[in-house]
Amino acid sequence: MPRPGLKTRSKRRVYVRTPGGKVVIHYEPRKPGPARCAICGKPLNGVPRLIPSKLRKLAKTEKRPERPYGGYICPRCLSRLLRESIRASISS
């Protein structure tokens, strides 16, 4: 019988076979949804779907791409944004 705190669907059930041959259920937090672009809403590549405690253990470069606005804006929107800003600075 699970503890009352584990009788919720907000936890993921993982079936694990123990060395003794029994199958037991481990309760883990669910993965969060993918990080999305702030402009177009497309899921971002290079940003892991991890809970904050596991994300904290990653190196800085494993958390998001190494480019301006990496982990916040997708490359397509970034290139469009840079083109617009350069054109605006040239015209004025």
Swiss-Prot record:
Locate the coiled-coil region(s) and give their ranges. none
Per the record, a Pfam family?
Ribosomal_L34e
Disulfide bond is among the record's keywords: no
Asked if the record carries the keyword Repeat, the reply is: no
Quote the PROSITE patterns the UniProt record gives. Answer: RIBOSOMAL_L34E (PS01145)
Q: What Gene Ontology terms describe what this protein does at the molecular function level?
A: structural constituent of ribosome
InterPro entries of this UniProt entry? Ribosomal_eL34, Ribosomal_eL34_C_sf, Ribosomal_eL34_CS, Ribosomal_L34e_arc-type
What Gene Ontology terms describe where this protein resides (cellular component)?
A: ribonucleoprotein complex; ribosome
List the keywords (alphabetical): Ribonucleoprotein, Ribosomal protein
Q: Which Gene3D superfamilies does UniProt cross-reference here?
A: 6.20.340.10
Q: Name one GO biological process term.
A: translation
Give the superkingdom in one word. Archaea
Family that this chain belongs to:
Belongs to the eukaryotic ribosomal protein eL34 family.
| Listed name of the protein | Large ribosomal subunit protein eL34
The record lists the organism as Staphylothermus marinus (strain ATCC 43588 / DSM 3639 / JCM 9404 / F1)
Q: Which gene encodes it?
A: rpl34e
